[in-house]
Amino acid sequence: MGQIVEQAGGVGLNANTSSEATRYFYSFPANKLELWMSLESDRFLDPVFREFYKEKEVILEERRMRIENSPIGQMVEKFIDTAFKVHPYRRPVIGYDQDIRNLTPENVKKFFDAYYVPSNLTIAIVGDVNPAEVKKLAQTYFGRYQSKPKPQQQLPIEPQQTATKEVTLELSTQPWYLEGYHRPAITDSDNAVYEIIGSLLSDGRTSRLYKSLVEKQNLALTAEGSSGFPGDKYPNLIFFYALTSPGKTVDEIAIALRQEIEKLKTEPVSAVELTRLKTQARAGLLRGLNSNSGMAEQLLEYEVKTGSWRNLFGQLDKIAAVTPEDIQRVAKATFTPENRIVGKLLSKQPG
């Protein structure tokens, strides 16, 4: 398939899997729409798993690199497993080593037949194409795609956390400190507030955590975070992490991080800082729409996660509407000891 795509002028043929979906994507010249339909219908209607064992080894090696041979990879896996008791977010996207080893072609075929069905598939096409022609070709090439209901999955609801959770690992590494808090899904009315808080605290060198922990106090070599971790379709985490500077401890990081969090509760964000954060957030969304591939990705994400691609543009209005009072309200409700998960990756002592 890769050779056909390349010869037809296609670029970026790839796929990825997250906590919520598997995506297949590439870009084609506009006049190759019918070839795209032919290739994709063949992928989903007549799959061949001839390289199963080769790909299985690739995945095992990827897990070794990302997790088994990575102290922070091991820590993050343990951290997520501690944060979630029942929700599937607790499982690593790549899977556990033994599960991968035990996987058979029959397992894959059974999964494919259950989940790769029209009712569970969303396609985004962006470019110089005629919508009527797209629908006509889709009917031609996907018309025989047998309709089946989505697999009936009753995802367990994560119970409310009632006390701080903590996990500690000792490995051969410079110490890391991780701290997370449960937050609602992307469809929640306060999603934009959480995004602003995440940016305010941990997005880049202008963030409060970087300025305080790295530049002012020299406690950390890096201080970052993420809102919507490990996914955001369902209730998830707002998550912060820092690599300690030589001679500093994870406990010092914890104190400094919580001081910044407490400021959000007690000190309203200034108009200047909030305007900057809103501008950055809006620019980030709009920047993703600058290319056809970026627009397809963004529209697809909102369609799948929120029920409508139009919610992407509604997010712009919600960002603009965030107030200092919103930030204080959400910070007070979210950043509590009962809602906290702590991860400490400590240096393993010799002997």
Question: Where are the regions a protein language model picked out?
Answer:
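Short amphipathic alpha-helices in soluble, non-transmembrane regions
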Residues: 37-42, 136-141, 253-259
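Short, polar/flexible loop-turn hinges at active-site or ligand-entry regions and domain interfaces
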Residues: 43-52, 66, 269-270
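Short beta-strands and strand-coil junctions in structured, solvent-facing domains, enriched
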Residues: 45-46, 131-132, 184-188, 247-250, ...
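Bacterial peptidoglycan biogenesis and beta-lactam-recognition machinery
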Residues: 45-50, 130-132, 142-148
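Hard-cation-handling environments
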Residues: 291, 314
